[in-house]
Structures are given as C-alpha cells and as structure tokens.
C-alpha cells in the first residue's frame, strides 16, 4: 500500500495517532491533513458498534449506515488486525449500490468512480487490510500525501503524539464542520461529519482545501 506524503505541512512536528477505519469520517481525514506524521493504531482490541467497520453516508432518505460484516471470534479479546471479514454474502455489492443511489448525481461521483469501484470488487481476508486500502484510495483521490508508521504495542495513554483514537467511536466524534453542498441537502438539511466519501463526491479536488480550513 502506498500513501502519499504531504508537501505543505501546516503544523511541523505534529504526530497524530489514529485508528484505520473503513472510508473514515471527515474528522479522521482532517486529523491526518493537519499532521506531519501519522501513526496507525494496530494493536487495539476490536470493539463492536464503532467506526472500525461502519460508515455513514447521505442517502436519498437521509443518513444511512453501511456496516462491514465480520467474523466474531470466541476469544474475549481479539485484536482488530486479526478480525476477518464475513464472506457469506456479497456485502460489497450492496455497499456500492448504496453509494450509487446516494451519490450518482453528485458533481464528482463519476470522476472518482474508477478509483473507488475496485475495492468493492476485491476480496479481502482481514478488516484491517480493507480499512488501510480505503484510506490509501481516498488519500490518492484527495492528493493528500503523508508519512505514516504503525504501532507495535498498545498503550492506553499516549504522551508523544496527539491522540485521536477516540474518533473511532462515533458517539465521541462530535466535531462540527462548515457546511458544504450535499446532494439531498435541500430535502433533509446539512448532515455533519459523514464519511470522507461524502465530501469527496460533493467537493472533488476542493475537498482537501476544505479540510485545511476546518478545526478539530
């Protein structure tokens, strides 16, 4: 996997730690855009009902949750990097159909469609590999380049990095951002901090500039 390196660093020496997630929220990519170096948390235990395997998009009926099905282990504590994807049904096809229904009429869906579609056709074994690939794809689409490393041990408290790991819990991810035009905004109003896909399909190449103007 290749993730591109930022050429303009808004805050040199800023190192953030964050969870890889499935087409992450806008706040996730804002944290990355503000960073000099990104550290991905690889040693955490998997928790249900978090954004490790779910994403929120703006559908014709309002906010919609897309959940990535995983195989649950009998072990009390299973590391996220060891979690395997459920392959009993074609959830990838369902997810892409949902994205088409939500964003086919957006300004930039067709522009990025060929970049996004392949990940829904590829069969991954592990959730972590899927998450990292979706982040790599989005980084390329945004032209957002950054250096990154991975943890080799879990620490509850981090003192040498800006800790954004709480963003993986959607209930604690309460950041509010400047509104931008959304496909169904006139029908349902502005929906804040959805998947980065929502920003990408609506703002296109301007999405990175939008991120740089926001505060987290």
Range-by-range predicted roles:
Residues 2-216:
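Residues lining hydrophobic/aromatic ligand-binding pockets adjacent to catalytic sites
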């Amino acid at each position: 996997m290749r993730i591109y390196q930022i050429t303009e660093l808004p805050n040199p020496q800023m190192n953030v730690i964050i969870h890889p997630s499935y087409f992450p929220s806008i706040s996730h990519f804002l944290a990355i855009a503000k960073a000099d170096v990104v550290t991905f948390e690889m040693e955490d235990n998997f928790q249900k009902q978090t954004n490790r395997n779910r994403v929120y998009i703006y559908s014709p009926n309002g906010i919609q949750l897309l959940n990535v099905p995983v195989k649950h282990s009998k072990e009390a504590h299973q590391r996220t990097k060891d979690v395997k994807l459920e392959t009993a049904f074609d959830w990838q096809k369902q997810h892409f159909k949902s994205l088409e229904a939500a964003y086919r009429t957006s300004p930039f869906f067709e522009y990025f469609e060929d970049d996004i579609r392949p990940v829904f056709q590829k069969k991954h074994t592990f959730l972590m590999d899927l998450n990292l690939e979706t982040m790599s794809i989005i980084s390329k689409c945004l032209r957002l380049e950054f250096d990154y490393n991975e943890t080799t041990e879990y620490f509850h408290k981090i003192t040498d990095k800006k800790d954004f790991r709480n963003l993986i819990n959607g209930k604690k991810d309460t950041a509010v951002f400047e509104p931008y035009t959304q496909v169904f905004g006139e029908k349902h109003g502005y929906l804040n901090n959805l998947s980065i896909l929502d920003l990408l399909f609506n703002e296109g190449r301007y999405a990175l500039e939008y991120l740089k103007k926001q505060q987290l």
